[in-house]
Amino acid sequence: MTDSLIRIAVAGSGGRMGRQLIQAVQQAPGVVLGAAISRPGSSLIGTDAGELAGVGALGVTVSDSLEKVVDDFDILIDFTRPESTLAYLAFCVEHKKAMVIGTTGFDDAGKDAIRAAGQQIGIVFAANFSVGVNLVLKLLEKAAQVMGDYTDIEIIEAHHRHKVDAPSGTALAMGEAIAGALGRDLKECAVYAREGYTGERDPKSIGFATVRAGDIVGEHTAMFADIGERVEITHKASSRMTFASGAVRAASWLHNHDKGLFDMRDVLNLDQL
């Protein structure tokens, strides 16, 4: 631990989220952009990362590999794709670099790899880095404890047309929060699609519905529906900056933890509520 600035590397720096992350690093106290990574062969290699993100020249050029910038960063923030994240993870374990992982769509093997890596380096792994979403997850646990056993539970999520995984990682996290509060296994009670003659609804199921359209940043609603009333808990994001700022906040928090697997509940100390 040091009083100097925390050096952040941003993976996928040429993407929508990567540029937002660079902006968030520039706006946050106590951190500085140390490196920016893009895929090999990208036309952005060699570009100034600050100019790419619209914050002015920073003197940090986009690189095509972590090996080339290994001495330039302390923590990697990665919102890319599972296969890229796992490759970065192996590198960070080898070189004792901490990671903030916002990538979604991992299979069980990928999640196991992240858990194992948390025994050697510090990792914050979350489906959503928005402070509001993580507060919603806490509220859902409370709602499930009060209403979950006698209501029908449905989760509806909407994202932009370019999102490649469904349901979203946040929707699944909402389902896990609810199922955990009710002592259920989400793998056993989740219903991801309904078509044709489905029969009556299983009262113990948790349903998911997905929308992909336009430029929706992210909207999630959990519904607890009874006869005569229903409670809906909704979060709507209007800018990716909320996720980027949360990820940088997580990186600042993680700098004080040498190893361990954490999520935003830890960063925000939500378990104390």
UniProtKB/Swiss-Prot annotation:
Residues involved in NAD(+) binding: G12, S13, G14, G15, R16, M17, G102, T103, T104, A126, A127, N128, F129
Active site per the UniProt annotation: H159 (proton donor/acceptor), K163 (proton donor)
Q: Which GO terms describe its molecular function?
A: 4-hydroxy-tetrahydrodipicolinate reductase; NAD binding; NADP binding; oxidoreductase activity, acting on CH or CH2 groups, NAD or NADP as acceptor
PROSITE patterns cross-referenced by the UniProt entry: DAPB (PS01298)
What domain of life does the native source organism fall in? Answer: Bacteria
Pfam families referenced in this protein's UniProt entry, alphabetically = DapB_C, DapB_N
Q: Which UniProt keywords apply?
A: Amino-acid biosynthesis, Cytoplasm, Diaminopimelate biosynthesis, Lysine biosynthesis, NAD, NADP, Oxidoreductase
Q: EC annotation? A: 1.17.1.8
Provide the GO biological process annotations: diaminopimelate biosynthetic process; lysine biosynthetic process via diaminopimelate
Catalytic activity, reaction form:
(S)-2,3,4,5-tetrahydrodipicolinate + NAD(+) + H2O = (2S,4S)-4-hydroxy-2,3,4,5-tetrahydrodipicolinate + NADH + H(+); (S)-2,3,4,5-tetrahydrodipicolinate + NADP(+) + H2O = (2S,4S)-4-hydroxy-2,3,4,5-tetrahydrodipicolinate + NADPH + H(+)
Keyword presence, Cytoplasm: yes
* Known role: Catalyzes the conversion of 4-hydroxy-tetrahydrodipicolinate (HTPA) to tetrahydrodipicolinate.
This protein's assembly is summarised as: Homotetramer.
Return the protein name.
4-hydroxy-tetrahydrodipicolinate reductase
Ranked from the top, the taxonomy reads: Bacteria, Pseudomonadati, Pseudomonadota, Gammaproteobacteria, Enterobacterales
